[in-house]
Amino acid sequence: MKLILSTLIVFIHTLLVSALPTKEGSDPNSAKKYLVSDLPGLHENITPDNSIPLMFAGQLEIYPETDTHYFFWKFSDSNPETVTNRTIFWLNGGPGCSSMDGALLETGPFRINSQQQVISNNGSWHKMGDIIYVDQPAGTGFSYSDTYITDLDQVAEYFLKFMEKYYELFPEEIGYEIYFAGESYAGQYIPYIADAILQRNKKLVDGEHKYDLRGVLIGNGWVSPNEQSLSYLPFFKDHGLIDVHHPKWATLLAKHEQCQKIVNKIDSTFDDGVVHYYEVSSSTCEAILTDLLEYTQDTASEKDQRCVNMYDYTLRDSYPSCGMNWPYELVNVGPFLRQEKVMHQLNLINLKKWNECNGRVGRTFQARHSIPAVHLLPELAKEIPVMLFNGANDIICNSQGVLSYLQKLQWNGETGFTNKDNQISWIYDNKEVGYIIWERNISFINIYNSSHMVPYDLPDVSRALIDLITGKYDEKDVDGKKSFVTYPLGSRKESDASADGEENAGSDKVPGDSPSQTIDPMISSSTASSSSVESSLSSSTASADSDSTSSKFTRLIQLAVILVIFWGVYVLYASYKSRPSSIIKKPTNNTSNVTRSSAGKKKNVQWADQLNQFEDDERTQEPNQGIIAKAIGKITGSKDTRGRYAPVQRGNGNEYIDDIELGEGLSDPNVDEFIIGSDDDEEQGQAHSGAATHNQKQKPMN
């Protein structure tokens, strides 16, 4: 009888499931397929419900022939005060580091607590426009492919293909104003992508739409590698981290002079348009930071306080981690994203184990045939605003290095800033938070009390960068100094806004003096009749309405089927109870024992994705790397691989799990490649991998 009842229950369930209408978004081209409706802690910690952003996420196929999928996570304000048809693409660096750092540690609406639940980030950029975090190049984060790319022109090519596929999902957004933002090695990615978009816009064919690129924002960017490294010794000296009486000063000064010779050589051939090995190879200059971190150890301090944090000189860390155990909340992000339920909630089709950085991606991506992105800035500045913002406490991509390469750069008819001492105070929420130099469509913004990751330290201040680049600020005289004044979200005074409107005759200000050919970054409040929330789902609304009648009819059929089945069950049960009791015999002891023994046996069943995870966990890692082994992602290599692709290995060595953006290994001067440390907590047995991997040394790329 139990078997009959079980069979009937399964039959009922099968009928119900088969009678249900197709799940919304089952069409691979439907945006609803990528809708994210739940996450751990979402409805408990993010209140009220109308403050929960509209989210889409998933692994979007861009090149089926190589099984290349880019993971994206999009956030839109579900309750916007004003409709702004604006899209912000955010990229982290590495190369090979996931943009989920940006989403969950910096500019996204969530942070992750120690219970691996989402909590609010009140400085989220999604209040300023739709923001999309993309794991790229392929192999980074949740993105995957059969091949890895090697050069910056490929980064641009792949990202434009991603944009093409993205706008197929969200066609109503193709006319939105576009901004790119990111940090660190994204200082190489973003200029290349922006340049490719501008070139594409000049060669549109029938049926193609212009991408309305309005500006780029690069935070603590690795834009001019050798020039940046030349700033390390002056930075340490200026901030009291070393002085001329240090016993290693002469050694450091000699290396600094070697780096200066390389930079001089780069300067002499800067405009010839040729990729020179001495410019794309930066190991000599980067070795200065390695030595500085070693020589300035405070061996008398506690073990975890001996080394300067290279991402924030005001902090300390163990040696040789020197900042790899930071940011501290990173230990929550990995376990959160590795939860299988979270992977399903993010609509993953490949349940790939997330790691902050993938060393194989970084080592394959050598950029040997790509001129550093600093060469692209002048052309970009002819058409769009270029904003370079820096946390003042950062060492590895410090402000001195940025100003140094800008002062040599020629753009829009002049060299450098004509008066870099003419600094504009930046006032946010009645406090001076930094200073601005803005001329001819390139701006430099130095932000006080912040690190390599400005939005991590000052999320609300960083969000106001969007106000600066879009002209949503007030110019005032504060304490006798020219100041740009921005405000917390929604608190800009009506009188100030009105005065600003009169002064600018209805248009937004453009900071600095833009050339005549510059596209002004005018981002006005849209008068569109629907919000981005509504438009994101508009493509599916019609089909949902057309299905409403059939859905009601289907439910009636379901109800009828259920009633018939329950009636049948009742008849069987009544027939069973009416049988003579003498027919029903108790089993013998032997039979009972056999039955119990048989019933007590259970099959050990594992899901396929569990087996995949076990295979991932059993993969061995490469030998440990050199001293910083995690600090600056170098754009180097030895083999001519332009336009070629590196196949992804299967089995052992498929995934190289690594740590923070901008890793480097400089222990061997003959080795010139990207090196970073492991971030896989489970495989390395560390709460955070930086301290576990400082002795790793990378083999040269073949």
From Swiss-Prot:
Biased amino acid composition, Low complexity: 524-548
Cytoplasmic side: 577-702
GO cellular component, one term: trans-Golgi network
Location of this chain's protein in the cell: Golgi apparatus, trans-Golgi network membrane
Major localization class: Golgi
UniProt signal peptide: 1-19
Sugar-modified residues: 85, 122, 441, 449
Enzyme class: hydrolase
Sorted UniProt keywords: Apoptosis, Carboxypeptidase, Glycoprotein, Golgi apparatus, Hydrolase, Membrane, Protease, Signal, Transmembrane, Transmembrane helix
Biased amino acid composition, Polar residues: 587-598, 692-702
Biological process terms in GO annotation: apoptotic process; protein processing; symbiont-mediated cytolysis of host cell
Catalytic activity: Preferential release of a C-terminal arginine or lysine residue
Lumenal side: 20-555
Example GO molecular function: serine-type carboxypeptidase activity
Active site, renumbered: 184, 394, 452
Topology of the protein relative to the lipid bilayer: Single-pass type I membrane protein
InterPro entries in UniProt: AB_hydrolase_fold (IPR029058), Peptidase_S10 (IPR001563), Ser_caboxypep_his_AS (IPR033124)
Protein role: Protease with a carboxypeptidase B-like function involved in the C-terminal processing of the lysine and arginine residues from protein precursors. Promotes cell fusion and is involved in the programmed cell death.
Protein family per UniProt: Belongs to the peptidase S10 family.
Descriptive protein name: Pheromone-processing carboxypeptidase KEX1
Protein's organism: Candida albicans (strain SC5314 / ATCC MYA-2876)
